[in-house]
Amino acid sequence: METSEILKKVRQIEIKTRGLSNNIFAGQYHSAFKGRGMSFSEVREYQFGDDIRDIDWNVTARFNKPYVKVFEEERELTVMLMVDVSGSLEFGTIKQLKKDMVTEIAATLAFSAIQNNDKIGVIFFSDRIEEFIPPKKGRKHILYIIRELIDFQPESRRTNIRLALEYLTNVMKRRCTAFILSDFIDQESFKNALTIANRKHDVVALQVYDRRVSDLPPVGLMRIKDAETGHEQWIDTSSKAVRRAHRDWWIQKQTELNDTFTKSNVDAVSVRTDQDYVKALLNLFAKRN
């Protein structure tokens, strides 16, 4: 994509998503994600009713009387966007590509973050870590992120969510809120990595998918190509049995995915490319309040 085209698209996305974050998500984002981390504030003398687990034994020994550590809600968050850039995101049959919706959702979350004085960073991943953008504040930083979202060219077309989660756990030393934006087509189990990551951080899953992945249209013979492996096959979509089998496969896959999120205690939301992601995000925020 030419530089002028990229800049034009960056501007278009900024106008749309910044408006959403300012006018619709302002209070919702704050209440959904603020106050989930605690930081040390001060030490004071023990008072009746204080939790004995908060006693600072070093200070207590020094002054020969019990002192406790006082914590307060962290006033700013570090937000990480974990963006799937594998080949399957370059797919879309209705309205827009999955990649385009992921870009808009990521930009909306980014503007919501800086509006609340939070730092925002990005992990682009396929079956490897493609790029890590360290968390920072500011509009200039957000515009750089949007530009990367629009024009990023991954080295690999495959996906490995487990690897991305392990990277998050290792590279982010302090607690953060991490949004995974993916179609979650990855077949490899990532439940253990997700559980471990969510113990250290606040992980939220955002699934973006195309309607034709869940429901095949009855259009006769159709050639299907796996965007990640390149494997092709022909199927007869005029057959009700074929369409039903595909639908059953999708339902089973979604059931397993939702089970993974539930067992890992991770909030998740799914949205189709022909649906309104604003409503999906508002539902997610409401779930967390």
Task: Annotate each language-model stretch with its function.
Residues E104, T108, T159-E166, T255, ...:
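Short, contiguous clusters of charged residues that form electrostatic/catalytic patches at enzyme active sites
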Residues L89, T93, L149-Q153, N265:
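Short amphipathic alpha-helical interaction patches enriched in hydrophobic/aromatic residues
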Residues H141-C176, E188-F190, D210:
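Von Willebrand factor
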Residues N58, P154-R158, L181-S182:
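Short, flexible loop segments at the rims of nucleotide/cofactor-binding pockets, characterized by
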Residues M1-E130, P135, T177-I180, Q187-E188, ...:
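An amphipathic, basic-hydrophobic helix/alpha-beta surface used to engage anionic
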Residues D100, E155-R162, D248-I251:
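Conserved phosphate-coordination/catalytic loops
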Residues F132-R147, D259, A286-K287:
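Short, electropositive alpha-helical surface patch
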Residues M1-F33, E42, D51, N170-R174, ...:
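Von Willebrand factor type A / integrin I
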